[in-house]
Amino acid sequence: MDISEGNKTLVTEFVLTGLTDRPWLHVLFFVVFLVVYLITMVGNLGLIVLIWNDPHLHMPMYLFLGGLAFSDACTSTSITPRMLVNFLDKTAMISLAECITQFYFFASSATTECFLLVMMAYDRYVAICNPLLYPVMMSNKLSAQLLSISYVIGFLHPLVHVSLLLRLTFCRFNIIHYFYCEILQLFKISCNGPSINALMIFIFGAFIQIPTLMTIIISYTRVLFDILKKKSEKGRSKAFSTCGAHLLSVSLYYGTLIFMYVRPASGLAEDQDKVYSLFYTIIIPLLNPFIYSLRNKKVMHALRRVIRK
């Protein structure tokens, strides 16, 4: 839909071109991503229910893990259902209001996840490096407060970008060459200059992603040195097993996020950017519940107790 304003025709609906311009692949992609979405939701929501119902998992580590699972479920839900609709809809239209809403919920869950990963790294640092002080330094009350702070920051941060986004007008093009309403793609088709918007994305991205990543790196560096000091091979194996999964998830998540949002314009192909976006919007939310659960003995014991019932 277009609205006339003076001599300009303002665009209020956009066309999402999706992952491919080959129509014969749409049905195949629909089936693949539907299966991925269902597995993602079952994995993450199942993990939340498991942690909620099992008293043995009512500990800070699993509280953060449950928070991460909820954040991943929100990330996937903000992107995948609309993408599935577009695979079957020849027009693939999305309104400006829907576009901004999709961006808000994605940005909110992504911001929350950055801080949750920091909390989880700190939790592992305290548990491995200061086990005797763990009940004091990471109590259930403190972990609940930290979890709440992560979600509050995640709720507030995207409002800055949404308010700036509402200042932009779209009057020339309405085609977004992407599979969701990615904010940098909206900047490309805006009529008025998005330089302030782009600057805020870079500044907030740098101030959120880089300090949180550095905190995680420092925490795990300390953990690594502590592990290497352990004489027990069993103790080393257990600690590496616990932290290795976390580091894998962090590397994938931060690597793609920083490459997308904390970098100068590089003129890279849009298809390459789509691949990076797929990692933090769809692939990582799919993998996280399995990365954290399959190597965690307490989670697996809790799952076996549920199956036996």
UniProtKB/Swiss-Prot annotation:
InterPro entries noted in UniProt: GPCR_Rhodpsn, GPCR_Rhodpsn_7TM, Olfact_rcpt
Naturally occurring in which organism (per UniProt): Homo sapiens
SUPFAM superfamilies: Family A G protein-coupled receptor-like
Its job: Odorant receptor.
Main location: membrane
Disulfide-linked positions: 99-191
Membrane-spanning parts: 28-48, 57-77, 102-122, 136-156, 199-219, 240-260, 274-294
Residue intervals on the Extracellular side: 1-27, 78-101, 157-198, 261-273
Name of the protein described by the UniProt record: Olfactory receptor 5AC2
Topology in membrane: Multi-pass membrane protein
Assigned GO CC terms: membrane; plasma membrane
Glycan-modified residues: 7
Ranges facing Cytoplasmic side: 49-56, 123-135, 220-239, 295-309
GO-annotated biological processes: sensory perception of smell
Keyword NADP appears in the UniProt entry: no
Keywords: Cell membrane, Disulfide bond, G-protein coupled receptor, Glycoprotein, Membrane, Olfaction, Receptor, Sensory transduction, Transducer, Transmembrane, Transmembrane helix
Gene: OR5AC2
Recorded GO MF terms: G protein-coupled receptor activity; odorant binding; olfactory receptor activity
Family per record: Belongs to the G-protein coupled receptor 1 family.
Compartment annotation: Cell membrane
